[in-house]
Structure formats: structure tokens, C-alpha cells
Amino acid sequence: MLRMNDELMLVEPSEEYFAELAAYRDDFLENSDSMDGCGPLRRFDDMKAYLEDTMRYTREETLPEGMVLATQFLCIRKSDNRLVGMIQVRHYLNDFLRTLGGHIGYSVRPSERRKGYASWMLKNVQPYCKSLGLSEILVCCLDTNEGSRRTILKNGGRFDGTAYHACLLYTSPSPRDCS
């Protein structure tokens, strides 16, 4: 569960967080873990190049063909400026995202799991989703990922079925205000 003294914030990636991004990436690679909601972070050992690539997804004129607009957020623990999670919001869905990725992808640093960070991120990104005009939010997880399944349900998710590779599909009827 999230400890009360762990104040968190969602911020967009910037040079200020290059060292934390590199350490976050290393934590996942050392654990041979999936890096959901991180965009192409796995492919980049140069954080400046990662940031430049991530920014391409924020504007129609630089968006790679076949991709969707997306906003990347870092979840920073204020007490030590540590990157504990990442969450990506896709502004709309293409065919692939309708059955596998959804509007939101997220991950929590392996060494920081089971502290409520995923639930906090999912709850606190919903006002941003609402500002994009999303009336429903699709969030997916593998059927073997019990932690994500519970996180999604805790945040108003409703089971909508199973798609490819045992991906469970959940929708929230509307983004909730978090005030």
C-alpha cells in the first residue's frame, strides 16, 4: 500500500530525469522484465535520444506512420526524486491498441512494486484522459498479471473480455476526477 509520506507527482520526461530514466531502464533489464507504458525506453541507452523519440509521439506532424499520439509521464517520489513508475496515455486507439495495448500502459520499477504506485498512477492520470475527451479508457493486462488486474478493477475497470495472447480487456466508463 502507498505510504502516506510518499508524495508522488506525474511529470513529463525531461533532461532533469535522465539519470533516473537510465536507472529505471537498468532495473527492468536486470530483472528481465516487461517495460509496459515506457514507450521505446528499452531500445535506448542514450536518454537524450529517448526523450527526442518520445517527443515525436506528441505532435501529429512528427508522429511516425501507423502510430497514435501519446503522452508519457514519469511517476516521481518527491522525497528522494526517485522514478518509481511510468505511465503512457494514448490519445486514441488504432486496431492494434483496441485489442492489445489500450489507452494506458504503465509499469512500476521492480524494486518498488506492491506499494500502491500503479494504482496511484492510474487514478491520477484519469483527469488528463478526461481533458483529451476520452469517454472510456481501455486498459489491458495479461491474464497472468494479477497485480495489474486488481489495480485496474480498483480504479473502476470493468472486465470486457479476452483478446490475443490472453490479454484481458477492461474499460472504465468515464475518467474519474481525482479531487
PLM regions with names:
Residues 1-53:
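A short, well-structured alpha-helix characteristic of acyl/acetyltransferase catalytic modules
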Residues 106, 114-127, 150, 154:
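Conserved acetyl-CoA-binding loop-helix of GNAT-fold acetyltransferases
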Residues 170-179:
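Single conserved hydrophobic/aromatic residue that forms the stacking wall/gate
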Residues 76, 90, 103-114:
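A short, internal acetyl-CoA/4′-phosphopantetheine-binding micro-motif in the GNAT/acyltransferase core
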Residues 131-140:
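Conserved GNAT acetyl-CoA-binding A-motif
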Residues 140-141, 158-169:
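Conserved catalytic-core motifs of GNAT/GCN5-like acyltransferases
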Residues 42-99:
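Acetyl-CoA-dependent GNAT
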Residues 144-159:
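Conserved active-site alpha-helix within GNAT-family acetyltransferase domains
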